[in-house]
């Protein structure tokens, strides 16, 4: 049976595993280093099969051998930045975690496509690509699907349309330097830049950029996981089914947008084996400058890795 593995059984990983098994296109293995957590959560999710009608199995495990033969491996493992911790300290810890995860995943699933979720996601996707030695098409990261979903929500509320009527375009770093592209964000086929003022577009963009932080401010002791898990599940489904769907993802660039040897959020086509095509948009001078500025932020993070 086809298989997808999720590494990490925290809020994002477990909710993702639930969404994947409910889509019912593959068996799901949820792995975590903490004994009992993935097993208990998988058992709980499995007991909804009769109610929801899915037929594939979900398994929780602490053993990477259970992930063998996965077509897709989603990596959510990593720690969040704690008070007093420098970015360099966070990167060092998450680099060690990513090194262990990539090594073990590819040991049992050498043909898998890797989908990276761990933060800072652009840098961790770059690290996974370097560690794995895989072709760039087989390593992608979550970025613009989530950021675009946030943008679409705020645009839809502003214009009184359904979120599904919005085709968002968000590029660059998954973070503070993220670049919203109003000219390429469409609402029922019309550019957002033609529907709202530049000031309103900036306001909507800022809210999308701060979407995750806004949720953290409400929750106090946690961060977003419902929208992230839905975004990852959509990426996994596009890869698994070979749909060729256009999504904004963190991808390894090799000359696109004048950038090389870096991971950055750009529009891509996802299909069998991962990245089918990077779509190069005709950016104007201002848009290109903002994208390059965002790339500099990611370059700084990559430079802090021990490679």
From Swiss-Prot:
One Pfam family named in its UniProt record: Ldh_1_C
Superkingdom as given in the UniProt entry: Bacteria
Binding site for substrate: 81, 87, 119, 150
GO terms under biological process: lactate metabolic process; tricarboxylic acid cycle
InterPro entries, per the entry: L-lactate/malate_DH, Lactate/malate_DH_C, Lactate/malate_DH_N, Lactate_DH/Glyco_Ohase_4_C, Malate_DH_type3, NAD(P)-bd_dom_sf
Active-site residues from the entry: 174
UniProt-listed Enzyme Commission number(s): 1.1.1.37
Keywords (A to Z) from UniProt: NAD, Oxidoreductase, Tricarboxylic acid cycle
Keyword NAD appears in the UniProt entry: yes
Residues reported in the UniProt entry to bind NAD(+): 8-13, 32, 94, 117-119
Enzyme class per UniProt: oxidoreductase
Keyword NAD: yes
Family: Belongs to the LDH/MDH superfamily. MDH type 3 family.
Database matches in PANTHER family: L-2-HYDROXYCARBOXYLATE DEHYDROGENASE (NAD(P)(+)), L-LACTATE DEHYDROGENASE
Protein name as catalogued: Malate dehydrogenase
Source organism: Dehalococcoides mccartyi (strain ATCC BAA-2266 / KCTC 15142 / 195)
Taxonomic lineage: Bacteria, Bacillati, Chloroflexota, Dehalococcoidia, Dehalococcoidales
Underlying gene: mdh
